[in-house]
Amino acid sequence: MNINDFDFDLPEELIAQTPLEKRSESRLLILDPKTEELEDRHFYDIIDELEAGDALVLNNTRVLPARLHGERAETGGHIELLLLKDMGENRWETLAKPARKMKVGEEVVFGDGRLKAVVVEILEHGGRIVEFKYDGIFLEILESLGEMPLPPYIHEQLEDQERYQTVFAKENGSAAAPTAGLHYTPELLEKIADKGVKIVELTLHVGLGTFRPVSVDNVDEHHMHSEFYRLTEEAAAQLRAVKASGHKIFASGTTSIRTLETIGSKFDGDIQADSGWTDIFIKPGYEWKVVDAFNTNFHLPKSTLVMLVAAFAGRDFVLEAYQHAIDEKYRFFSFGDAMFVRSKNK
């Protein structure tokens, strides 16, 4: 497979720069892989796609205010640090700007000096492992000093930081939001639960690799970044019961999909409690283990996320749906509109 098989022309004005005032009023394009029909709806209509006894799986990760601005202790020069991965023992994998200034042993001071970082290792791809020094609670210091790391294609300032969090976000650790979940409101989730749908949560901490472009022409040569995931015993038991009863598992977003399919691949289609790091790459030809249907946003051309959707619904149909969305002026990417991909077995 060639990377250009997943390309399309996207007018820049369709890239949403700000979220809608009301989350669930975004548009929803419904894709039916069986009939290859498309339907224009609104996100609050997603309740019509769910039936009593089904499960809706949400990713409860919370985005960290992971962008820090500091000064080199030695010279006072400005340094921007972006936290990517918690390595434990106060050490984080980071991206630094300007990176060339950040040599091993270099110290950076943030804010009033409550937080300091020392470079302990330089990584092959140019990242830096830093060790933080501080008094107090790290997350509280980060909340007061850090900024939300919005995606590179969003150029507007976000007035309300919570609009880049889902309403069910609780597990700190992501460098980016699981954007498919941004459309849900407490009221919509309550209506879905009242219908008899089980709402099940898992955790996958989204890394910035989600925005990293594929750099090879041959898709099979691409290696995914790894991300931490967790599915609890209670959640796994709920999902097993849904499957056993013949009902469907609906995943909200590619992060929920990648978690469930990682576990399904690991346990031969069974759903077990598990945690660890996943670098699963779902592309056309993949054999699905767990997920029956899902909602997701509209993704970047030539991205692994477009490939994931194509693996489920077929490349030609997905590109047809994307062209329809462009023609109908749907809003794209993190703050944009959504699609719902129905089960192939419905």
Curated annotation (Swiss-Prot):
Pfam family, one: Queuosine_synth
Keywords assigned by UniProt, alphabetized: Cytoplasm, Queuosine biosynthesis, S-adenosyl-L-methionine, Transferase
Transmembrane segments: none
InterPro entries for the chain: QueA, QueA_dom1, QueA_dom2, QueA_sf
Location within or outside the cell: Cytoplasm
UniProt entry tagged with the keyword Transferase: yes
Catalysis performed (reactions): 7-aminomethyl-7-carbaguanosine(34) in tRNA + S-adenosyl-L-methionine = epoxyqueuosine(34) in tRNA + adenine + L-methionine + 2 H(+)
Principal EC category: transferase
Protein's pathway: tRNA modification; tRNA-queuosine biosynthesis
EC code: 2.4.99.17
Gene Ontology molecular-function annotations: S-adenosylmethionine:tRNA ribosyltransferase-isomerase activity
A single cellular component GO annotation: cytoplasm
Keyword Magnesium part of the UniProt annotation: no
Gene Ontology annotations of biological process type: queuosine biosynthetic process; tRNA wobble guanine modification
Record-linked SUPFAM superfamilies: QueA-like
Family designation: Belongs to the QueA family.
Subunit structure: Monomer.
Free-text function comment from the UniProt entry: Transfers and isomerizes the ribose moiety from AdoMet to the 7-aminomethyl group of 7-deazaguanine (preQ1-tRNA) to give epoxyqueuosine (oQ-tRNA).
NCBIfam families reported in the protein's UniProt record: PRK00147.1, queA
Name listed for the protein in its UniProt record: S-adenosylmethionine:tRNA ribosyltransferase-isomerase
Organism listed in the record: Lactococcus lactis subsp. cremoris (strain MG1363)
